[in-house]
Amino acid sequence: MIYLNNVILNDKTLPMCFNLSVNAGERVAIIGESGAGKSTLLNLIAGFEFPAQGEIWLNDKNHTRSAPYERPVSMLFQENNLFPHLTVQQNLALGIKPSLKLTALEQEKIEQVACSVGLGDYLERLPNSLSGGQKQRVALARCLLRDKPILLLDEPFSALDQKLRVEMLALIAKLCDEKDLTLLLVTHQPSELIGSIDQVLVVENGQISQLQKGV
C-alpha cells in the first residue's frame, strides 16, 4: 500500500504537491512530460528526497522521514549500476550482503532469483559480456533479492528496443503476480502496458493531474 497525503516538495524551479493512494498489489503506470515530477515522485516514495510537509505511508507505516534502507521499497533505474569487474553472481550478492560472503542459503537464493529472470546460465559472466536486456535483468534480480513488497521502476527499459521492452514488461508482470508486488512504473510508452496495469497516473507541473483506472 502507498499513501501520500499532501506531500509538498519546495523545489526552486517547480514546487510539487502529491496526493496518491495505491492499494497493495496494484500496478500503476506514471506518465507525463519530462521535468513534470515523475522521477521526483518515486524519489520521495523511496526516501531519496524528503518533503517539506505532508505524510508518506507505505504498508500501513509512516515512512515520511525514514531512510531509504528502512522503507519496504526497491527501485530500478534506467542505469543498471552494475560493477564491471564483478561477475553477475557477485553483482547480485551485493543486493543482500555487501561483503559478498554468502551463506549456502543466500547462495541458493541468488541462484533461484537468477533463474526466475532467465539468468541461471550467466552467473559467472562479467557485465561487459551481456546485452542491454541482460544487464537490466541483473539489476532487476538484485532488486528482487531485497524482498521488498513495493517495486519502483524509473524508465528502466527506455534504452532497449521495443521487442526487449515488451519482454521485460512481461517478465515484470509475471514477477508481480508471483510475489504479489505493488508496482509503480514511469514510462513514455504507456501503450505497451495495456492490459497489464490497474491505473495510469498523469503527472503535470509537479502534481498528479489525472488518474485513469482499468487500462
From Swiss-Prot:
It comes from Haemophilus influenzae (strain ATCC 51907 / DSM 11121 / KW20 / Rd). It catalyses: thiamine(out) + ATP + H2O = thiamine(in) + ADP + phosphate + H(+). It is found in: Cell inner membrane. It is a peripheral membrane protein. NCBIfam families: thiQ. This is Thiamine import ATP-binding protein ThiQ. GO terms for cellular component: plasma membrane. GO terms for molecular function: ABC-type thiamine transporter activity; ATP binding; ATP hydrolysis activity. Belongs to the ABC transporter superfamily. Thiamine importer (TC 3.A.1.19.1) family. Residues 2-215 form the ABC transporter domain. SUPFAM superfamilies: P-loop containing nucleoside triphosphate hydrolases. Part of the ABC transporter complex ThiBPQ involved in thiamine import. Responsible for energy coupling to the transport system. Transmembrane segments: none annotated. It holds the Pfam family ABC_tran. Its EC number is 7.6.2.15. The keyword Glycoprotein does not apply. The keyword ATP-binding applies. SMART domains: AAA. Keywords: ATP-binding, Cell inner membrane, Cell membrane, Membrane, Nucleotide-binding, Translocase, Transport. It is an enzyme of class 7 (translocase). The complex is composed of two ATP-binding proteins (ThiQ), two transmembrane proteins (ThiP) and a solute-binding protein (ThiB). ATP binds at residues 32-39.
